[in-house]
């Protein structure tokens, strides 16, 4: 969108602004107040209505430009040499700058701008801001001497340095450790005596004993923790039986004592034929008792038969008793092994039957002899 009007006019914007620019230049050179620019501005406002229409057509751009020129009218022009020295960092030339003058406040139209009755809050601010007199920039020349003043100032006292650590000799450490093994806590006289012996102060001995006691406690605690960790890891590696290890040991202690027993019979055959086992001796004695009882019963039966047959039978039957009694050692020999018990019983029954048959036979022969 073009800012120029669509229809042509007999004058231009430059014709309207040229009187203002000339007045601004005069004010800048003379350093005067705002009276002349305002008069020139009023003359510009007194233009024909066509000029007002042209200014309205220009819009806010023209208003901002006019306001900028009006504000800049009250600012005095600075010399390029003074500003150049300030920009280059040369503070020595600050005294050459002209003093600042508040022409807006000092002009005749100042009360119209600021008002005759200012806000009651402003005095509190002006008290901190100071008077509105011109600010003298010549005092800035003293800034160059700040470096010299800072050099002449004494340095601030720093924090006290930490005392250097004292290293004990090997002989001192050996004596301290030897005394620590004997006695972990020392009284004041003992501390002084030990310190005088190893050329230390009682405070150093006291601190060394404190540190050494703490060191021993920490080592003992670390060692116990390491042993506990090893036990836990060992129990976990054994299939999670770490918690049951004490219970297993207690059960083994409460269980009866185990005794090694040799094998006597295997598959019906004695393992040791030459030396009878301790259990076999009792079995052998029991078998002998049974054999003796059976022999006595056989003898009683034979005696009854002999008494019934006659006196001859009494002489003949005792001759056979040793034979029957003599068979008991054989029975005892057969009873040496538990496997022969069944055969022993059968042999005893056979012995009884054979004895009775033999008695009957003897009686018959005796009868036959009598008949002869």
Swiss-Prot record:
Q: Which SUPFAM superfamilies match?
A: Homeodomain-like
Q: Which GO terms describe its cellular component?
A: nucleoplasm; nucleus; transcription regulator complex
Keyword Phosphoprotein (UniProt) = yes
Q: Which Gene3D superfamilies match?
A: Homeodomain-like
What are the Phosphoserine sites (modified residues) in this protein? Answer: 255
Signal peptide annotation: none
Name the keywords, alphabetized: Activator, Biological rhythms, DNA-binding, Homeobox, Nucleus, Phosphoprotein, Repressor, Transcription, Transcription regulation
Q: Where is the composition biased (Gly residues)?
A: 233-244
Q: Where is this region: Disordered?
A: 219-258, 269-288, 312-340
Positions of the DNA-binding region: 161-220
Q: One GO molecular function term? A: transcription coregulator binding
Q: Where is the composition biased (Low complexity)?
A: 245-254, 273-288
Q: Where in the cell is it found?
A: Nucleus
Q: How is this chain modified after translation?
A: Phosphorylated on serine residues by STK3/MST2.
Question: Per the entry, what induces it?
Answer: Expression oscillates in a diurnal and melatonin-dependent fashion in the preoptic area (POA) region in the hypothalamus, with maximal expression attained during the dark phase of the light/dark cycle.
Which GO BP terms apply? anatomical structure formation involved in morphogenesis; animal organ morphogenesis; axon guidance; brain development; cell differentiation; cellular response to leptin stimulus; cerebral cortex cell migration; cerebral cortex GABAergic interneuron differentiation
Tissue distribution is: Thyroid, lung and CNS. Expressed in restricted regions of the developing brain within the diencephalon, in parts of the hypothalamus and neurohypophysis, and in the telencephalon.
Report if keyword Mitochondrion is assigned.
no
Q: How does it assemble?
A: Interacts with WWTR1.
Q: Which family does it belong to?
A: Belongs to the NK-2 homeobox family.
Function text = Transcription factor that binds and activates the promoter of thyroid specific genes such as thyroglobulin, thyroperoxidase, and thyrotropin receptor. Crucial in the maintenance of the thyroid differentiation phenotype. May play a role in lung development and surfactant homeostasis. Forms a regulatory loop with GRHL2 that coordinates lung epithelial cell morphogenesis and differentiation. Activates the transcription of GNRHR and plays a role in enhancing the circadian oscillation of its gene expression. Represses the transcription of the circadian transcriptional repressor NR1D1.
Q: Kindly give the PANTHER family that the UniProt entry links to this protein.
A: HOMEOBOX PROTEIN NKX, HOMEOBOX PROTEIN NKX-2.1
Protein name per Swiss-Prot or TrEMBL: Homeobox protein Nkx-2.1
Organism lineage:
Eukaryota, Metazoa, Chordata, Craniata, Vertebrata
């Amino acid at each position: 969108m073009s800012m120029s009007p669509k229809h042509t006019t007999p004058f231009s914007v430059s014709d309207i602004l040229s009187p203002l620019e000339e007045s601004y230049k005069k004010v800048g050179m003379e350093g005067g107040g705002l009276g002349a620019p305002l008069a020139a501005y009023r003359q510009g406002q007194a233009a024909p209505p066509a000029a007002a229409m042209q200014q309205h057509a220009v819009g806010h751009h023209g208003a901002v430009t006019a306001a900028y020129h009006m504000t800049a009218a009250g600012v005095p022009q600075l010399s390029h040499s003074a500003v150049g020295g300030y920009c280059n960092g040369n503070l020595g030339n600050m005294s050459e700058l002209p003093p600042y003058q508040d022409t807006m406040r000092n002009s005749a139209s100042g009360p119209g701008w600021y008002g005759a009755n200012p806000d009651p809050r402003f005095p509190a601010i002006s008290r901190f801001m100071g008077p509105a007199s011109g600010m003298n920039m010549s005092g800035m020349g003293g800034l160059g001497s700040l470096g010299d003043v800072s050099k002449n100032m004494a340095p601030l006292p720093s924090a006290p340095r930490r005392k250097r650590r004292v290293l004990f000799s090997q002989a001192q450490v050996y004596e301290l450790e030897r005394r620590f093994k004997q006695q972990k806590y020392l009284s004041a006289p003992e501390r002084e005596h030990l310190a005088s012996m190893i050329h230390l102060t009682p405070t150093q001995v006291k601190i060394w004993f404190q540190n050494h006691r703490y060191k021993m406690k920490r080592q003992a605690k670390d060692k116990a923790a390491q042993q506990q960790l090893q036990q836990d890891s060992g129990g976990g590696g054994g299939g999670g039986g770490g918690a049951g290890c004490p219970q297993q040991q207690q059960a083994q202690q409460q269980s009866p004592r185990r005794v090694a027993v040799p094998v006597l019979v295997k598959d019906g055959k004695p393992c040791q034929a030459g030396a009878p086992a301790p259990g076999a001796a009792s079995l052998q004695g029991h078998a002998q008792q049974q054999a003796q009882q059976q022999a006595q019963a056989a003898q009683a039966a034979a005696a009854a038969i002999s008494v019934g047959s006659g006196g001859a039978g009494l002489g003949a039957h005792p001759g056979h008793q040793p034979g029957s009694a003599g068979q008991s050692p054989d029975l005892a020999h057969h009873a040496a092994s538990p496997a022969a018990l069944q055969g022993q019983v059968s042999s005893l029954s056979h012995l009884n039957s054979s004895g009775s048959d033999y008695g009957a036979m003897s009686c018959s022969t005796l009868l036959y002899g009598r008949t002869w």
